[in-house]
C-alpha cells in the first residue's frame, strides 16, 4: 500500500505530515482528519462527533498516533461538521480534539487489520439511522428516523429570560444542516417557532442534540418536537418569518406569518406575532454579555458549548449613549396612578423580571417614573412583560429611557422620598448566577405562585391574607409534594399584580417571608 494515491487513505497517518503550515488548507472532502484523540477513546465516541451532521460511512482509528479518519456520507455533511467545529472545539473525554478536511476523497479500509470494532460501531449506528435500533437512552422518537418523518420541527422556548430571535434560531439550527424556512409566533404565552430543514435527517439530529438544552445560562430552554406539517409556506420575509430560498418575498409588515390552513393545522390563532414585535426600541437580535452559550451534550462527548457568534447579532447592539435603544438599562414608566404608586412598589413589580437598582418617581409629574435595571436585557424583559398591563386602574406604559442612569438627589435637594436606591437590596431575585428564579419568569397572570410558606400557615390563613389586601380569591391549592408552595388564583391579572406588590416578602412568622411570583399554571 502506498499513501500517495489521492483516492484513498491508509493507516500510515500521512495527513499528519501536512499540518506543518507548508501548504494551504485542504479543499472540502467528505473524509475528515482528527488529531489528538485520547488513546483510550472508543470507536463509538469518535463516530459520535459526526453523528449530528449526517451519516458516518467509515472510520479508521490510528490509536498509536492519536489520530482518526472519519468518512461522512456526503461532502455537505462534512462541511456542516467543519463549520460547526471551527469556532467550537469538540472534546472527547474532556480532551480537545482537532478536525480538518483530509486531502483524501474516501476511506479504503477493506484489507486493513483491527477494523472489526470500527465496522461493528458503524453497523450499530447504521441500524439506528435506518430505524431498526434505538440509541441507548433515546426514545423511539429521538433515536430512529421514522418513515415519512417530517423535516419540520416545532420549537418552544421555555423560561424566556432573554429575547430569542429568528436570526438566533437560524444560527443554532444551521449547525445541523440547511435551514430552508422559519416561522416564529406566540401561542399560550410561549414563544414558538416552526423550522424546516432540507432533509428530515437534519431535523432528526437537531432534535437529538438540542432538545432540552438552554440557549443562555439557566434560561431559554429549547423544547423540540417533529411537526405534523411536512413543509412551510412562508409569504413574507421579516423578523417573524423567513424563507431562505426566496429572498424576493415582501416584508408584509403587519400581516400574519401563517396562512389560515397552516395555522389551523398547527392549532394556532390566525394572527401570529413575535412577542417582541413592535416593542419600543427592540432590535431583531441582541447579543447579551451574560450569554455563556448553548451546551449540547446530547451526543456523548461530541458537542461542546455553542456560543452564539457575533455574525448573528452584528450591528444589533445599541451605541453607548444612544437614546431609546437596546443597550440602555433605564426604563421610562408612564401613566401610573400617583395616588397608589411608590418607589418600593415599582421595585417589587419590576423586580420580577430583573434586579432593580434605582427608582425615581418624577417630582413634578408623579404619574411618570424612571426604573433602572441591572442591565439592558433585564430592562427589555421587564418592558416586554409589563407595558400594557393595568395597575391601580391605569394602563402602565414602559419604554426605554434616554437616560443612562437614575441620578440620586443631591444633599439638601427636595425629593419627598421619591428616589430610592435598591442596588444592595436583599430582595433581588437574580443576584445569584444560575438561580432557579431564571427558570420561573412568566408574564403577569391571575394565578400567583407562593413559596416559603411555614408549616403552621393554613390555606385559610393565606386566603384571608389576600382577601384583606382587597383581592377576590377564586381558587387555592397547595403543592401536593411540597406544602411550602401553593397557587392562588385571583379575580384578574390586575388584582394579581397589585397583590404581588403588596404581599411579596410579607412576614408570615417563624422567620418566613412570603415569596410571590406569577405562575404559568392555572388551578
Swiss-Prot record:
The modification N6-acetyllysine is found at residue 394. The modification Phosphotyrosine is found at residue 98. There is a cross-link at residues 36, 187 (Glycyl lysine isopeptide (Lys-Gly) (interchain with G-Cter in SUMO2)). The modification Phosphoserine is found at residue 425. The keyword Ubl conjugation applies. PROSITE patterns: RRM. It comes from the Eukaryota. Keywords: Acetylation, Differentiation, Erythrocyte maturation, Isopeptide bond, mRNA processing, mRNA splicing, Phosphoprotein, Repeat, Repressor, RNA-binding, Ubl conjugation. GO terms for biological process: erythrocyte maturation; mRNA processing; negative regulation of mRNA splicing, via spliceosome; RNA splicing. The keyword Repressor applies. Residues 1-25, 406-426 are annotated as: Disordered. RNA-binding protein that mediates pre-mRNA alternative splicing regulation. Plays a role in the regulation of cell proliferation, differentiation and migration. Positive regulator of EPO-dependent erythropoiesis. Participates in cell differentiation regulation by repressing tissue-specific exons. Promotes Fas exon 6 skipping. Binds RNA, preferentially to both poly(G) and poly(U). NCBIfam families: hnRNP-L_PTB. This is Polypyrimidine tract-binding protein 3. The gene is Ptbp3.
Amino acid at each position: 500500500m502506498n499513501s500517495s494515491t489521492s483516492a484513498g487513505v491508509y493507516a500510515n497517518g500521512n495527513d499528519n505530515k501536512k499540518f506543518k503550515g507548508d501548504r494551504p488548507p485542504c479543499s472540502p472532502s467528505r473524509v475528515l482528519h482528527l488529531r489528538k484523540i485520547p488513546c483510550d477513546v472508543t470507536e463509538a465516541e469518535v463516530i459520535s462527533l459526526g453523528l449530528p451532521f449526517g451519516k458516518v460511512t467509515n472510520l479508521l482509528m490510528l490509536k498509536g498516533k492519536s489520530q482518526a479518519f472519519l468518512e461522512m456520507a456526503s461532502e455537505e455533511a462534512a462541511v456542516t461538521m467543519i463549520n460547526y467545529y471551527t469556532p467550537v472545539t469538540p472534546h472527547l473525554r474532556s480532551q480537545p480534539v482537532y478536525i480538518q478536511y483530509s486531502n483524501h476523497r474516501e476511506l479504503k479500509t477493506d484489507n486493513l487489520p483491527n477494523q472489526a470494532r470500527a465496522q461493528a460501531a458503524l453497523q450499530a449506528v447504521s441500524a439506528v439511522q435506518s430505524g431498526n435500533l434505538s440509541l441507548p437512552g433515546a426514545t423511539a422518537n429521538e433515536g430512529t428516523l421514522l418513515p415519512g418523518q417530517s423535516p419540520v420541527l416545532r420549537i418552544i422556548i421555555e423560561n424566556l429570560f432573554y429575547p430569542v430571535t429568528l436570526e438566533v434560531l437560524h444560527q443554532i439550527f444551521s449547525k445541523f444542516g440547511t435551514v430552508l424556512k422559519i416561522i416564529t409566533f406566540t401561542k399560550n404565552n410561549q414563544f414558538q417557532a416552526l423550522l424546516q430543514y432540507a432533509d428530515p435527517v437534519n431535523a432528526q439530529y437537531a432534535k437529538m442534540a438540542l432538545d432540552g438544552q438552554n440557549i443562555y445560562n439557566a434560561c431559554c430552554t429549547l423544547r423540540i418536537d417533529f411537526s405534523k406539517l411536512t413543509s412551510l409556506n412562508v409569504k413574507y420575509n421579516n423578523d417573524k418569518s423567513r424563507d431562505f430560498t426566496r429572498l424576493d418575498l415582501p416584508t408584509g409588515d403587519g400581516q400574519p406569518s401563517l396562512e389560515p390552513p397552516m395555522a389551523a393545522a398547527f392549532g394556532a390563532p390566525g394572527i401570529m406575532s413575535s412577542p417582541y414585535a413592535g416593542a419600543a426600541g427592540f432590535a431583531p437580535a441582541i447579543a447579551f454579555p451574560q450569554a455563556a452559550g448553548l451546551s449540547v451534550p446530547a451526543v456523548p462527548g461530541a458537542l461542546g458549548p455553542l456560543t452564539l457568534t457575533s455574525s448573528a447579532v452584528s450591528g444589533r447592539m445599541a451605541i453607548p449613549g444612544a437614546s431609546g435603544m437596546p443597550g440602555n438599562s433605564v426604563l421610562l414608566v408612564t401613566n401610573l396612578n400617583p395616588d397608589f404608586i411608590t418607589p418600593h412598589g415599582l421595585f417589587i413589580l419590576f423586580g420580577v423580571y430583573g434586579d432593580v437598582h434605582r427608582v425615581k418617581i418624577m417630582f413634578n409629574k408623579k404619574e411618570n417614573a424612571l426604573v433602572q435595571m441591572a442591565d439592558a436585557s433585564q430592562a427589555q424583559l421587564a418592558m416586554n412583560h409589563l407595558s400594557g398591563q393595568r395597575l391601580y386602574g391605569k394602563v402602565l406604559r414602559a419604554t426605554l429611557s434616554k437616560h443612562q442612569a437614575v441620578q440620586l438627589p443631591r444633599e439638601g435637594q427636595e425629593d419627598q422620598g421619591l428616589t430610592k436606591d435598591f442596588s444592595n437590596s436583599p430582595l433581588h431575585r437574580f443576584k445569584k448566577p444560575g438561580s432557579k428564579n431564571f427558570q420561573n419568569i412568566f408574564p403577569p397572570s391571575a394565578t400567583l405562585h407562593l413559596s416559603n410558606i411555614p408549616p403552621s400557615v393554613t390555606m385559610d390563613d393565606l386566603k384571608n391574607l389576600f382577601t384583606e389586601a382587597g383581592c377576590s380569591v377564586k381558587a387555592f391549592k397547595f403543592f401536593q409534594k411540597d406544602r411550602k408552595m401553593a397557587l392562588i388564583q385571583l379575580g384578574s391579572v390586575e388584582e394579581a399584580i397589585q397583590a404581588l406588590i403588596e404581599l411579596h416578602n410579607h412576614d408570615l412568622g417563624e422567620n418566613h417571608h412570603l415569596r410571590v411570583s406569577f405562575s404559568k399554571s392555572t388551578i
